[in-house]
Amino acid sequence: MGTVTLIGTFHEERGRVSSSELNEILKRVTPEVIFIEEPPSVWKGLAVLSKTKPLESAAISKYIETASAELVPVDLYTPPEPYVSHVREVLSYVERVSDTFCQLVDLNKAKMEAEGFSYLNGEFHEQVELAIRNEIVRILGLRKSDPFDRAYEAWRGQDERRE
């Protein structure tokens, strides 16, 4: 039976979270299969992926220059545009009204830049992400806005379906 290694990434370069670092991880792991966070229905290869997920695309492209790996798209679906704009609106609102949210997001960014993939794949990152989500829920609870609640629930539902 094979080994499955899950590597949490970020879709853009940020300090030590870089395509070169991810490529080094891939070289150490030597995967036979790389699962791509992309719905099979829209998968058109790495060239197209580079527009939405440049970090992963660059690392995988570099890796397969010298190694063989099957690329398998596995995401469930692409969320509709209203979903994306609603989530952006919710996050923008929470950012405007919550210093705690901003501090947590800044901490997340700083840790990614300084510690890279070891942070992204560690327990402390999970704790920070949970604190960010809890702060979003707290702020939305204060607002009592149906459109924001629906947008947040759609976002959480999307995350749950993907997990």
Question: Where are the model-predicted features located?
Answer:
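Proline-aspartate-enriched helix->loop->beta-strand connector
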Residues: 26, 30-36
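Short, acidic/polar
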Residues: 17-27
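Hydrophobic, often amphipathic alpha-helical segments used for membrane interaction and targeting
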Residues: 48-163
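Short loop/turn segments at strand-loop or loop-helix junctions that form parts
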Residues: 35-41, 74-79
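Short, flexible loop segments at the rims of nucleotide/cofactor-binding pockets, characterized by
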Residues: 10-15, 49-50
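Metabolite-binding pocket within alpha/beta catalytic cores that recognizes anionic/polar moieties
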Residues: 31, 41-48
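Extreme N-terminal starter segment of soluble prokaryotic enzymes
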Residues: 1-5
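Structured catalytic-domain cores with a bias toward divalent-metal coordination
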Residues: 20, 30-32, 68-70
